[in-house]
Design a protein with these regions (language model features):
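FAD-site-proximal beta/loop scaffold in flavoenzymes
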Residues: 1-65
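Hydrophobic pocket-lining residues within nucleotide cofactor-binding pockets
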Residues: 17, 43, 76, 110, ...
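Small-molecule pocket liners
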Residues: 22, 77-78, 127
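Solvent-exposed alpha-helices and their adjacent loops that cap or buttress functional pockets
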Residues: 31-32, 36, 72-73, 119-121
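Short amphipathic alpha-helical segments
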Residues: 36, 76-77, 136-138
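Internal hydrophobic alpha-helix adjacent to the cofactor/substrate pocket in enzyme cavities
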Residues: 51-74, 101-102, 160-161
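Flexible, glycine-rich terminal cap/loop adjacent to redox cofactors
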Residues: 65, 82-92, 97-184
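Flexible, acidic loop-helix segments that line cofactor/substrate-binding pockets
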Residues: 70-85
Length: 184
């Protein structure tokens, strides 16, 4: 079950392209060990999500064109398109515990948002924000509609290392469900 990169039978060994784990080894510009071969998408083995592949391809194209750009896997959103939706970006509590890292968790019910209540009759949900010792946002996990539309905002905070105070200086439109991030 699941997906995995298929690197066999591609003839990569003929080009001396290195394999790392289950995928093709690439650098931050998506360049393989061969100076003229780039890789993006599932074949890299990092994140088997279409939106990651789009970004990896963009980074590769930028590098080919001489435009400075680097791939970062720090804040790739993952979404489960169910009802209610689930969305996640950044680190998880389990990951942090396993690595012995200290962190804080702030949980707030999605029903704190009047817009969420109006659009999700009898709906429940949760926003969980994870911060490090310096109060930097390092993870966000959402349960409730429209989590898939909100998670990108949290991803920007994770990717850029915003503290909670820096993040809260952003003005969120009212009434929106995304305000839940501001309230967390």
């Amino acid at each position: 079950m699941g997906r995995r990169p298929i690197t066999k039978s591609l003839g990569l060994e003929n080009l001396a392209i290195e394999i790392q784990g289950a995928g093709v080894k690439v650098n931050e510009h998506m360049l393989t060990s061969h100076p003229h071969v780039y890789a993006a998408g599932d074949i890299t083995g990092f994140s088997l999500l279409a939106h990651t592949a789009y970004r990896e391809a963009e980074v590769a194209i930028h590098h080919i064109l001489g435009i400075p750009d680097e791939m970062s896997y720090k804040a790739i959103p993952a979404v489960v398109y169910t009802n209610p939706e689930l969305a996640s970006v950044g680190k998880t509590e389990e990951e942090l515990i396993a690595n012995g890292e200290s962190f804080r968790v702030q949980k707030i019910p999605m029903t704190y948002s009047g817009r969420f209540v109006a659009e999700n009759e009898n709906g429940n949900g949760l926003c969980k924000l994870i911060t490090d010792d310096e109060d930097r946002i390092i993870g966000c996990h959402l349960l409730g509609n429209p989590a898939s539309e909100i998670i990108v905002t949290a991803g920007i905070a994770v990717e850029n290392g915003y503290t909670v105070d820096e993040f809260k200086k952003n003005i969120f439109p009212h009434p929106t469900v995304s305000e839940i991030l501001h309230e967390s």
